[in-house]
Amino acid sequence: MIPLQHGLLLAAILFVLGLTGLVIRRNLLFMLICLEIMINAAALAFVVAGSYWGQPDGQVMYILAITLAAAEASIGLALLLQLYRRRQTLNIDTVSEMRG
């Protein structure tokens, strides 16, 4: 069994990597991927904590997080596809410009 500190440290590292990618990247597709990494890091923390205390609640929350991530990914990819068809780019700087 993996110790609690190791699992939570791995989850924290994954979360920080996802957050860093979300802040640094300018492509919306990569930002969506980084958001998925952050959701998976939080789900990993739930599983590790549930395993440490011997409760199945962490695994239930993991299933809920995976369901949420799948819904978020499908809606996000559909929106990105429509955005790419209209603007021919996924760069956040060009997308955020408002028409006046």
Swiss-Prot record:
The chain crosses the membrane at residues 4-24, 28-48, 60-80. Its main location: membrane. GO terms for cellular component: NADH dehydrogenase complex; plasma membrane. It is a multi-pass membrane protein. It is found in: Cell inner membrane. Its EC number is 7.1.1.-. One of its GO terms (molecular function) is quinone binding. Pfam families: Oxidored_q2. The keyword Manganese does not apply. Keywords: Cell inner membrane, Cell membrane, Membrane, NAD, Quinone, Translocase, Transmembrane, Transmembrane helix, Transport, Ubiquinone. One of its GO terms (biological process) is ATP synthesis coupled electron transport. Belongs to the complex I subunit 4L family. NDH-1 shuttles electrons from NADH, via FMN and iron-sulfur (Fe-S) centers, to quinones in the respiratory chain. The immediate electron acceptor for the enzyme in this species is believed to be ubiquinone. Couples the redox reaction to proton translocation (for every two electrons transferred, four hydrogen ions are translocated across the cytoplasmic membrane), and thus conserves the redox energy in a proton gradient. HAMAP family: NDH1_NuoK. NDH-1 is composed of 13 different subunits. Subunits NuoA, H, J, K, L, M, N constitute the membrane sector of the complex. This is NADH-quinone oxidoreductase subunit K. The gene is nuoK.
